[in-house]
């Protein structure tokens, strides 16, 4: 069995990598992928904690997190497609400019 600390450290590393990608990247698609990594890191922490204490609550929360991630990804990708069709770019700096 994997120790609790190792699983939580891995989840924290994944979360920090996702947060770093979210802050550094200027492409909306990569920002969406980084957000997915962060959601999966939180789900991993739930599974590790549930496994450590021998409870099924971690797996239930994992299923809930995956459902949330799937809904977020589908809505996010639909919005990205519409944005790309209108602006022909996914760069956050050019999208945030206002017309005037």
UniProtKB/Swiss-Prot annotation:
The keyword Transferase does not apply. GO terms for biological process: ATP synthesis coupled electron transport. The keyword Transport applies. InterPro entries: NADH_UbQ_OxRdtase_chain4L/K, NUOK/Mnh_C1-like. It is found in: Cell inner membrane. It is an enzyme of class 7 (translocase). It catalyses: a quinone + NADH + 5 H(+)(in) = a quinol + NAD(+) + 4 H(+)(out). One of its GO terms (cellular component) is NADH dehydrogenase complex. It is a multi-pass membrane protein. The chain crosses the membrane at residues 4-24, 28-48, 60-80. One of its GO terms (molecular function) is NADH:ubiquinone reductase (non-electrogenic) activity. It comes from the Bacteria. Gene3D superfamilies: 1.10.287.3510. Its EC number is 7.1.1.-. Pfam families: Oxidored_q2. Keywords: Cell inner membrane, Cell membrane, Membrane, NAD, Quinone, Translocase, Transmembrane, Transmembrane helix, Transport, Ubiquinone. Belongs to the complex I subunit 4L family. NDH-1 is composed of 13 different subunits. Subunits NuoA, H, J, K, L, M, N constitute the membrane sector of the complex. NDH-1 shuttles electrons from NADH, via FMN and iron-sulfur (Fe-S) centers, to quinones in the respiratory chain. The immediate electron acceptor for the enzyme in this species is believed to be ubiquinone. Couples the redox reaction to proton translocation (for every two electrons transferred, four hydrogen ions are translocated across the cytoplasmic membrane), and thus conserves the redox energy in a proton gradient. This is NADH-quinone oxidoreductase subunit K. The gene is nuoK.
């Amino acid at each position: 069995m994997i120790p609790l600390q190792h699983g939580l450290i891995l989840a924290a590393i994944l979360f920090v990598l996702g947060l770093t990608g979210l802050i550094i990247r200027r492409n909306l698609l990569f920002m969406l992928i980084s957000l997915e990594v962060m959601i999966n890191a939180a789900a991993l922490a739930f599974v590790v904690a549930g496994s450590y204490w021998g409870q099924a609550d971690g797996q239930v929360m994992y299923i809930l997190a995956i459902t949330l991630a799937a809904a977020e990804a589908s809505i996010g990708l639909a919005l990205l497609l519409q944005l790309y069709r209108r602006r022909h770019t996914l760069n956050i700096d050019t999208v945030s400019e206002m017309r005037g």
